[in-house]
């Protein structure tokens, strides 16, 4: 939404937004080997140069010249998009489009919980209950018992309660810091 409203400092404009994309292959180039017309695919949202040190080490996600579709280059909110075969991942028929677009936020959630070394007795604070925050909540609730979710939308906070948040905070209408301290018995969160 920050890109749409022009408040995302990382974005370049003008810009067609949309970075979590599922599509159907309509046409392929001469060098395409594995994609077929009609394949349903999810698109890697980041592009990398393939030449810099991180790329040469297989870490294109931290490329020195990384560009994100929908942020730095045009994204998926259009009828057609040309994408290199290497950025397309064929989806099984058993996976719905709605579930497929959540693959990227879910992988970030898994990596976040893993890197945080989240433990059962941690007090986790998730700020934001959008796609990424909700994905973190789903993964973290399998590990951690004490999860606080903060957002400014009551409907998202209600969904968070049903998805495993022990506490929720509406950061627009409640004293955020006081609520965190109340829910953590004065300690504050151990992971956020």
Language-model-derived ranges and their functions:
Residues 1, 47-65:
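Local cysteine-cluster metal-coordination motifs and their immediate loop/turn environment
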Residues 5-53, 92-94:
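Glycine-rich beta-strand-centered segment in the early N-terminal region that forms part
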Residues 39-40, 54, 80, 123:
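Residue-level marker of beta-strand positions
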Residues 51-54, 72-84:
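A structural motif shared across PLP-dependent enzymes of the aminotransferase-like
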Residues 95-174:
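Mid-domain Rossmann-like dinucleotide-binding core that forms the NAD(H)/NADP(H) cofactor-binding site
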Residues 175-186:
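Short amphipathic alpha-helix with an adjacent loop that forms part of the alpha/beta core around
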Residues 187-191:
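Short SAM/SAH-binding signature in class I
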